[in-house]
């Protein structure tokens, strides 16, 4: 058998290809950013053609840099930013419109209408999700209602819908010359259109959004011994690689962190924060603002479910300090600037740029920096930004404990912000539990590689994956209980100030 497995990680701000060996160690990678298109306040788009070009480039470059051929790869996995939605023509491959990103809030009226007339309760029961701008169903409805000619093409079977996993897979396997139109259960579970029990598109839910079933991809398991397809020889890989794993990015991180047992949880720090708790084969409904979602499904096995707390803006808040405020020139400077002060100086930053996600689900909220006085400096704002990342995670951890009845004992973490030592120390302080980072912090790509490799026998099972996991760093809490309670009370007060800012019809 070939000695390596590759993964494409199509994220919110960049696309990367990573190659792993049997020990789960990285042997090569290449990464490219793509443009964030912001046409109106609250609107966030990506260019699908640019995403595909970046995908092809990172795959080819990673192979060339490691001097590997497609025959050296046992399989290829795909992981992706979830919910981001696009539609393209099956005959030409041309997108009808830019991809509407998961952070985009243009569908707030669609989401609000669903809740007002009672359809929201049906969506919660069947799909495990609250009506929100976050999810794909409303985005697809908006596209069908606002893009000229799309409704007719969808009815004729000429228009295809997908999240970015489906778009990448379709192009890798031939595009308009026979590309495979498939998604996996984890991505489908983020649309408000899939029934969690049947793992299929639900006709009643499709009717709520007036979406033709024929434009939707086939739903398959997250790890499939029968490949979804193979990369075409004329494509960027310059050869055939079986594509056998697909996972939404946060579910991929669960697999990469080897959170395969009931009660295991992880927090991924990226553009947003995403904390997932494995609930096993049981569908657990949340009473505290969390989502019920599919964690993964391997082959013919029963699906494994999870509770999730999704936070819209965390890492992107640091980007905002750089790109909009201009108080840092790079993300790493957020730590050095924040270290110039010992605390937040009474300043709290609630980065509700797209409203608030879990556990609040308030699209009427908007960002605010509160508690400012003439005493405060850029350093206090930087510190408040790092604290906001951690306090939002505390909100979700508390909700998760309320739903599960099990308090968190240790938090596994991964993602880019875990390189920020101060932020991770604050996270331990805010939660009052140890925070643990694995040696391989980019667990999203690793999880996609695991899903693909398990399908072809590159890894035999969960024990192989557990043997690969190694602790890389641990942070223990240093705050007193009084300090922790006082800080969190200030955060909750700040959150309250951001609500009811935008009128949502």
UniProtKB/Swiss-Prot annotation:
Leading EC class: transferase
The keyword Transferase is annotated on this UniProt entry: yes
InterPro entries for the chain: ATPase_NBD (IPR043129), Carb_kinase_FGGY (IPR000577), Carb_kinase_FGGY_CS (IPR018483), FGGY_C (IPR018485), FGGY_N (IPR018484), Glycerol_kin (IPR005999)
Any Pfam family matching the protein: FGGY_N
Biological process terms in GO annotation: glycerol catabolic process; glycerol metabolic process; glycerol-3-phosphate metabolic process
Keywords noted in UniProt: ATP-binding, Glycerol metabolism, Kinase, Nucleotide-binding, Transferase
Keyword Nucleotide-binding applies: yes
UniProt xrefs under CDD domains: ASKHA_NBD_FGGY_GK (cd07769)
Annotated residues for binding of ATP: 12-14, 271, 315, 319, 416
UniProt pathway: Polyol metabolism; glycerol degradation via glycerol kinase pathway; sn-glycerol 3-phosphate from glycerol: step 1/1
SUPFAM superfamilies: Actin-like ATPase domain
Superkingdom of the organism of origin: Bacteria
GO cellular component: cytosol
Signal peptide extent: none
Modulation of this protein's activity: Inhibited by fructose 1,6-bisphosphate (FBP).
Transmembrane segments: none
Binding site for glycerol: 82-83, 134, 249-250
Family in the record: Belongs to the FGGY kinase family.
Protein name listed in UniProt: Glycerol kinase
């Amino acid at each position: 058998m070939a000695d390596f497995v590759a993964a494409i990680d199509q994220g919110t701000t960049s696309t990367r290809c990573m190659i792993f060996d049997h020990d789960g160690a990285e042997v090569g990678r290449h990464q490219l950013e793509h443009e964030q298109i912001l046409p109106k306040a609250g609107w966030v788009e990506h260019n699908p053609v640019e995403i595909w070009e970046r995908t092809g480039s990172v795959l080819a470059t990673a192979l060339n840099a490691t001097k590997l051929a497609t025959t050296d790869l046992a399989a290829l996995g795909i992981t992706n930013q979830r919910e981001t939605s696009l539609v393209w023509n099956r005959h030409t491959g041309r997108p009808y419109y830019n991809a509407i990103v998961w952070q985009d809030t243009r569908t707030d009226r669609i989401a609000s209408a669903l809740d007002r007339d009672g359809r929201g309760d049906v969506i919660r029961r069947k799909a495990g999700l609250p009506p929100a701008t976050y999810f794909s169903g409303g985005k697809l409805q908006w596209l069908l209602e606002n893009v000229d000619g799309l409704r007719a093409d969808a009815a004729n079977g000429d228009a295809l819908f997908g999240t970015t996993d489906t778009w990448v897979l379709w192009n890798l396997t031939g595009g308009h010359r026979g590309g495979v139109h498939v998604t996996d259960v984890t991505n489908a579970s983020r649309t408000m259109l899939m029934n969690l029990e049947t793992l299929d598109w639900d006709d009643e839910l499709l009717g709520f959004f007036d979406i033709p079933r024929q434009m939707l991809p086939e739903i398959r398991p997250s790890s499939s011994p029968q490949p979804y397809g193979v990369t075409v020889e004329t494509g960027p890989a310059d050869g055939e690689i079986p594509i056998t794993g697909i996972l939404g990015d946060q579910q991929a991180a669960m697999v990469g962190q080897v959170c395969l047992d009931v009660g295991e949880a992880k927090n991924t720090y990226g553009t947003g924060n995403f904390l997932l708790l494995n609930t096993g084969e049981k569908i657990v409904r949340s009473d505290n603002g969390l989502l019920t979602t599919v964690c993964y499904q391997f082959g013919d096995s029963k699906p494994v479910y999870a509770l999730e707390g999704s936070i819209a803006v965390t890492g992107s808040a640091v980007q905002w300090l750089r790109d909009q405020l201009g108080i840092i020139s790079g993300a790493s400077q957020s730590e050095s600037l924040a270290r110039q002060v010992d605390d937040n100086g009474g300043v709290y930053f609630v980065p509700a740029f797209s409203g608030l996600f879990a556990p609040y689900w308030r699209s009427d909220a908007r960002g605010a920096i509160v508690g400012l006085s003439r005493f405060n400096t850029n350093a206090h704002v930087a510190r408040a930004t790092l604290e906001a990342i951690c306090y939002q995670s505390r909100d979700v951890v508390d909700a998760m404990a309320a739903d599960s009845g099990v308090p968190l004992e240790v938090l596994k973490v991964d993602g880019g912000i875990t390189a920020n030592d101060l932020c991770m120390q604050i996270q331990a302080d805010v939660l009052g539990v140890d925070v643990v980072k694995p040696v391989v912090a980019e667990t999203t790509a690793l999880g996609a590689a695991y899903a693909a490799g398990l399908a072809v026998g590159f890894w035999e099972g969960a024990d192989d994956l557990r043997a690969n996991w190694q602790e890389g760093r641990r942070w223990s809490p240093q705050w007193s209980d009084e300090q922790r309670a006082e800080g969190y009370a200030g955060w909750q007060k700040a959150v309250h100030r951001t609500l009811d800012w935008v009128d949502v019809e």
